[in-house]
Amino acid sequence: MHKAPKGTALAFDFGETRIGVAQGDAELGLSHPLSTVTGGSNDEKFAAIAKLVQEWQPRYFVVGLPVHTDGTKHEMTHLSRKFGRRLNGRFNLPVYWVDERLSSVYAESLLSEAQVFGKKRKSVLDQVAAQAILHGFFEGGPAECFNGREG
């Protein structure tokens, strides 16, 4: 258990094709879907993220860490960690990794309840998953912090 830091956060549901982004504030306990970063090179993706960082001025990042249902590493675990380290390196902000095991299931459930289907669903699914990741972080779920130093 942890207490989420004060201030604005940007959360990411990292994928090689799409990166869902959510924004929130721990003090208010609120988070909302923000954007989906798609396609292009890593430089193009980070340019899009830089615009969001400039607009929202976060104090830290939260990145979903994919693991299997039994808690073992997933093939995307390493890539998500690498993405988080790159965020830290480019923006010099702490990164919190959180277990994202059920974020997509939660996002699918929310979108079904809201009757969001088809192309609209695909366009917001990763954002809503990022929102679920951030919500779990705000609720005090387990998290691991990276602030530019290994160990």
From Swiss-Prot:
Keyword terms of this UniProt record: Cytoplasm, Hydrolase, Nuclease, Ribosome biogenesis
Segment forming the signal sequence: none
UniProt xrefs under Pfam families: RuvX
EC number: 3.1.-.-
GO biological process, alphabetically ordered: rRNA 5'-end processing
Keyword Cytoplasm included in the entry's annotation: yes
Entry annotated with the keyword NADP: no
Regions crossing the membrane: none
GO cellular component, one term: cytosol
MF GO annotations: nuclease activity
Entry's localization field: Cytoplasm
InterPro entries hit by this protein: RNaseH-like_sf, YqgF, YqgF/RNaseH-like_dom, YqgF/RNaseH-like_dom_sf
Family: Belongs to the YqgF nuclease family.
Role summary: Could be a nuclease involved in processing of the 5'-end of pre-16S rRNA.
Protein name, entry field: Putative pre-16S rRNA nuclease
Record organism: Neisseria meningitidis serogroup C (strain 053442)
